[in-house]
């Protein structure tokens, strides 16, 4: 999600595969 991209731990979410475009 766009909100996740704004989070400082976005890279962590990306690692976990939780980031949604």
UniProtKB/Swiss-Prot annotation:
Report the catalytic activity. (S)-2-amino-6-oxohexanoate + NADP(+) + H2O = L-2-aminoadipate + NADPH + 2 H(+); (S)-2-amino-6-oxohexanoate + NAD(+) + H2O = L-2-aminoadipate + NADH + 2 H(+)
- Per its UniProt entry, what is the enzyme's top EC class, as one word? oxidoreductase
Q: Which GO terms describe its molecular function?
A: L-aminoadipate-semialdehyde dehydrogenase activity
Q: Would you indicate the residue range of the signal peptide?
A: none
Domain of life according to the entry:
Eukaryota
Q: What are the entry keywords?
A: NAD, Oxidoreductase
What's the EC number here? Answer: 1.2.1.31
Q: How does activity depend on pH?
A: Optimum pH is 9-10.
Q: Which family does it belong to?
A: Belongs to the aldehyde dehydrogenase family.
Subunit composition and interactions: Homotetramer.
Q: Can you say what this protein is called? A: Alpha-aminoadipic semialdehyde dehydrogenase
- Origin species: Ctenopharyngodon idella (Grass carp)
């Amino acid at each position: 999600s766009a909100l996740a991209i704004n989070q400082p731990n976005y890279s962590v979410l990306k690692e976990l595969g939780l980031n949604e475009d």
